[in-house]
């Protein structure tokens, strides 16, 4: 029998599990306040669904051995979009859904072979809204969600914003392989690739300046207007960032616009965003999302409803940032029920049930204890529990 979990998998201790549950319940309360209904997408889906029309590479999906090509979900958006366009197709739009669950991603291990990453997520999806109002609601909801977590000031959260139309503007002068090469260099921030590429001097200068074009939305949009003139996407981003600026200031969240930012999965066809915080040793991504109209269209939605946007929060990194989550501790007193040889287990069980009836957590020592002092020492060793000593 193997005594180690599979590569990439991990065991969680009781406190970690309790903290995860507390975080997801806290987020769920916020989602419900905003009118979102809970759904539960399947963990196992057909590969065609999981790949989202080619937006997610098959190498990122944990495949199952089965007659049909099946896999474990690497994210939940594609599954929820499929359900929204099929079983939930008759529900009125806008349709607001939220879900919480485990996602699985496959990657190559350092020593070779497959490594499976298992992560807990909680997130929301908004279907049927074409205009920027969808993103305005979602990012306001993200801000409310982060506020509910009460992260410490040392985390220094930053909301990184991008837009696929900004990248299209940058790539518009290029075609074919050169376009792909420029895009790769920008996304991976590879200055050397840009400097050695066959480009006109002014093109190289523009691309290098765009690689440095990240910062406050107001400053970045001003630079982009200087390069590309007035564009509708600039007005949408201006409106969105104006809405977020007050809340971001109150919550000490830095807003950063990056025209070259593109997420890992190519699901998105509009606004994209990530919330990044300082971890204990390196920056960590706590949330990511964006607009994915093309995915909804592939799922069979009619043209007037083929709109979707959403985000997910990564529960495990959030848990690691909560150094001491007081709310994960029980509100009630923990009790150890112990009995002497003068009593018996049946009587001790009655005492335990009385504690439970009062809403208190109580655990039972199954063997008689020689003395009350020994029982008290046992209660302290198990976490300074209150002792209920049964001696008769």
UniProtKB/Swiss-Prot annotation:
Pathway in which this enzyme or protein is active: Amino-acid biosynthesis; L-histidine biosynthesis; L-histidine from 5-phospho-alpha-D-ribose 1-diphosphate: step 1/9
Cell location: Cytoplasm
Primary subcellular site in the record, as a coarse category: cytoplasm
Record GO terms (molecular function): histidine-tRNA ligase activity
Keywords recorded for this protein, A-Z: Amino-acid biosynthesis, Cytoplasm, Histidine biosynthesis
SUPFAM superfamilies: Class II aaRS and biotin synthetases
GO biological process: histidyl-tRNA aminoacylation; L-histidine biosynthetic process
GO cellular component, one term: cytoplasm
Lineage top rank: taxon: Bacteria
Extra facts: This function is generally fulfilled by the C-terminal part of HisG, which is missing in some bacteria such as this one.
Role: Required for the first step of histidine biosynthesis. May allow the feedback regulation of ATP phosphoribosyltransferase activity by histidine.
HAMAP family: HisZ
Family stated for the protein in its record: Belongs to the class-II aminoacyl-tRNA synthetase family. HisZ subfamily.
Subunit structure of this chain's protein: Heteromultimer composed of HisG and HisZ subunits.
Protein name: ATP phosphoribosyltransferase regulatory subunit
Gene symbol of the encoding locus: hisZ
């Amino acid at each position: 029998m193997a005594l180690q979990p599979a590569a990439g998998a991990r065991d969680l201790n009781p406190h970690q599990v309790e903290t995860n549950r507390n975080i997801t319940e806290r987020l769920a309360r916020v989602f419900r306040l905003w009118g979102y209904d809970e759904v539960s997408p399947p963990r196992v889906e057909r590969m065609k669904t999981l790949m989202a029309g080619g937006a997610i590479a098959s190498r990122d999906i944990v495949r199952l051995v089965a007659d049909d090509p099946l896999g474990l979900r690497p994210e939940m958006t594609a599954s929820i979009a499929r359900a929204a366009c099929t079983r939930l197709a008759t529900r009125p739009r806008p349709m607001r859904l939220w879900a919480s669950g485990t996602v699985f991603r496959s990657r190559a291990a350092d020593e070779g072979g497959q490594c499976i990453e298992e992560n807990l997520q909680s997130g929301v999806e908004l279907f049927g809204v074409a205009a920027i109002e969808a993103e305005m609601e979602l990012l306001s909801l993200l801000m409310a969600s982060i506020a509910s977590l009460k992260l410490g000031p040392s985390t220094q959260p930053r909301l990184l914003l991008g837009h696929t139309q900004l990248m299209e503007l940058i790539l518009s002068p290029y075609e074919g392989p050169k376009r792909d090469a420029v895009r790769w260099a920008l996304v991976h921030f590879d200055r050397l690739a840009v400097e050695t590429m066959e480009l006109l001097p002014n093109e190289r200068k523009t691309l290098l300046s765009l690689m440095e074009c990240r910062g406050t939305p107001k400053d970045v949009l001003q630079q982009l207007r200087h390069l590309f003139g007035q564009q509708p996407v600039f007005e949408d981003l201006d409106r969105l960032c104006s809405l977020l600026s007050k809340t971001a200031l109150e919550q000490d969240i830095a807003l950063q616009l990056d025209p070259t930012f593109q997420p890992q999965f190519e699901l998105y066809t509009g606004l994209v965003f990530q919330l990044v915080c300082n971890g204990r040793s390196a920056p960590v991504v706590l949330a990511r999302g964006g607009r994915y109209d093309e995915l909804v269209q592939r799922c069979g939605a009619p043209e007037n409803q083929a709109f979707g946007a959403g985000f997910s929060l990564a529960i495990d990194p959030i848990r690691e940032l909560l150094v001491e989550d007081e709310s994960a501790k029980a509100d009630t007193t923990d009790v150890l029920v112990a009995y002497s040889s003068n009593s018996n287990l049946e009587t001790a069980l009655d005492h335990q049930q009385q504690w439970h009836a009062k809403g208190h957590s109580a655990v039972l020592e199954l063997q008689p204890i020689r003395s009350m002092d020994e029982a008290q020492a046992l209660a302290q060793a198990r976490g300074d529990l209150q002792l209920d000593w049964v001696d008769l």
